[in-house]
Amino acid sequence: MKKIFILCFLLCACETVDRSTMNSVRLKSDATTDSIEHVVKEMLIAISTNDIEKARYHVFEDGRVFRIRKDGIGFRSNTDFFKQTADQSTDYFERMWDPIIMYRGDLAIAWTTYDFHLNGKFSHCGAESFTLTRFNNRWMVVDWAYTANETENCNSPLGPIEK
């Protein structure tokens, strides 16, 4: 419970920070931060392509997903995430920008802004936080949380989606 409270506090704190302040935060890039960022990007590609095998490769099955919205916090297991990712009836597309990555030893956190599209139409944007661990010499997403409130002021520097 303490872990959930801290995670929620950090995400709420991030929501109150001026985006121009966050754009000035740049941490040193190295082989480890690059490999952590790669895993997060691959996970988002798995979501966007309904690639269940890629999702299972990069996401630890026993983890959880936390969704934070104005109407409350929702939880689901990564197993449920896998089922949703495998669902070919919905076209998901998610992309991120300006990731901030920190690590020490076999523990890492990636924080980023993102936008999300359903069936080719913009749905929402927000902040997303990933907890990763190095397991059998490779990074895997264990838990992640995201805000899903914003439908305005979602000016992605990536421009409109191209499929």
Enumerate the predicted regions with their spans:
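A mature extracytoplasmic/lumenal domain signature
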Residues: V59, R69-D71, T112-F116, E128, ...
